[in-house]
Amino acid sequence: MTDIPRTLIICVSLHPISNQQKIDMQKNLVIVESPAKAKTIEKFLGKDYKVMSSYGHIRDLKTKDFSIDLEHNYAPEYVIPSDKKKLVTELKNEAKKAEQVWLASDEDREGEAISWHLYEVLGLKPENTKRIVFHEITKNAILHAIETPRDINIDLVNAQQARRILDRIVGFELSPILWRKVKPALSAGRVQSVAVRLIVEREREINEFVSEAAYRVIASFILPDGTTILKAELNRRLKDKEEVEAFLESCKDASFTIDDISKKPVRKTPAPPFTTSTLQQEAARKLGYSVSQTMMIAQRLYESGLITYMRTDSVNLSDLALGTAKEAILDTYGEKYYKFRQYHTKSKGAQEAHEAIRPTYISHDEISGTAQEKRLYELIRKRTIACQMADAELERTTISVGIGGKKEKFVATGEVITFDGFLQVYRESFDDENEKEQENGLLPPVTLNEVLSMKDIVATERFTQRPPRYTEASLVRRLEELGIGRPSTYAPTIQTIQNREYVVKGDKEGTERTYNIITLAQHTIKEVQKTEIVGADRNKLMPTDIGTVVNDFLMEYFPGVMDYNFTASVEKEFDAVAEGEMGWAGADRLPLHQGSELRFRSLFILWVRLPDLYDWAITTDLHENRFAALRIDTQFTLTHFMLRTDRGCLFHDRME
């Protein structure tokens, strides 16, 4: 009896499949990259199916070699790692048995590149190879993908290769310079070095910050009932002790009257569903997870079929997700709490999976798994449901207290929630104290022109706050704001700069500071001094000495590589390649940021072709103004070079 080719599947589903579908799929080989998906598929398909994994990329650039042919349009030189050769042989054997091969790696640029490498290495044929994608691991999603296959998107592959090649160029050309000039075994990278720059510059801002003092003045008034207290703040800060004392002196015999009461409705709108970066930020704030920890947990949830793909720029939700969210809201909270919202991704560069991160089954309010997985799943589910709920409605009341004819006023502001809406389910968190909304409660009832008795007025010396150090969450947000990196790069970038010991995440002890409190009560002004600890930080990112040295060296000699705009513009060029709007330089190979790329490539060539001169030149502070003439042909080959200093022309050469 002839054996029927066994099916190789690397995708996931949690539901049984019909006998007819089994017959159709038995002569198919389906490959994805994750062994966890394979394990789930085994439960889904049963013993009649052989399930395997490519375990990520099956080939890559050599680890220790440059592996890029600069003279031939940046052609990459790929190799199969020794630990993958046995697996590749097994995959080849299975592919030969199958009548149809389905490449089902993740739905992003990295996943597309994995499929392309599989296609090339396994020697697959276009007539019996299909590419399928799904952003959730469910029965319906997988079967729909098989019913609607496509070809490999070579534009996405080119975008991934362009990133890989440019990152290799920057890393392999800059790192040896750091070894020679700073310290052995250091590394530089197109994104990681810019991330370190952000942290170094923030630390310098903190060290150079000079705090300015001013007095915040708060009065406590007794209402006519004799017991109710109204607290209100002076509508300006007082600059020094003398001004405070003069103001309090003028208040000793002043009358205080309610001269204005205003009420206005306020609406709060829910945040969109999670993208990769917003999930990383919110998990750090609410759950205390590191960026890499969040992605590791989210990966497990995805591979278990519990959430959609976790590397995405998109805030879109599918029609199915919108419908199930509506059902969950109507069943639990009622029609008043539901509001349809269709979110659209603003960024043109949203190139990852085409849906936000959400539960695959929103009706499932609990899952099995570790405590960490349950907490992250609950966070994702609540955010998804909240984004389809009604606005919260509040009433904001502002009471103005006049001071006996003075232009200054005391102002009290309070909010009361009249309808909680989405706040019934979810409240968004903030990174820094100064971003947090004030939780002002309900104010006591007062009437216009009502006369109040002053209980006391307290002026407390306060100081301007220094810029906050970055947390992992706020660094992700800043990178995203600058257009640096993409969902797949945030976590590894932050992990890399810590592994390299350019940055540490740790605590910083504060310093003791003295401040004044001046009080007016019972016609008497009193002053006391108190102390407080300021500047203490917990779990913040701080540069190490070597991180600062490396940053300063790169900023001095390679400012183009370190420029925020350069790094962001390269990301846009990768996006353009992914959209098919531009090819690679030369033979459609590599998108070049012409100005900065040319500038730092010229320095690299000096180091590669003229190491002794380069070594001398850097030692004697080579800057752009020292170049008198520099000609580079289209292949970045040095043809003419002349170095000029204050003592005249020191070197002139021609290299064919």
Where are the predicted features?
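Phosphate-interacting basic helix/loop segments used at nucleotide- and nucleic-acid interfaces
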Residues: 79-101, 198-199, 282-283, 376-385, ...
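Short hydrophobic alpha-helical segments enriched in small aliphatic residues
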Residues: 12, 16, 615, 624, ...
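Intrinsically disordered, low-complexity regulatory segments
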Residues: 10-161, 430-434
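Metal- or metallocofactor-binding catalytic centers and their adjacent structured scaffolds
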Residues: 238-273, 450, 460, 565
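Hydrophobic, low-acid, alpha-helix-prone terminal segments
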Residues: 610, 622-630, 647-655
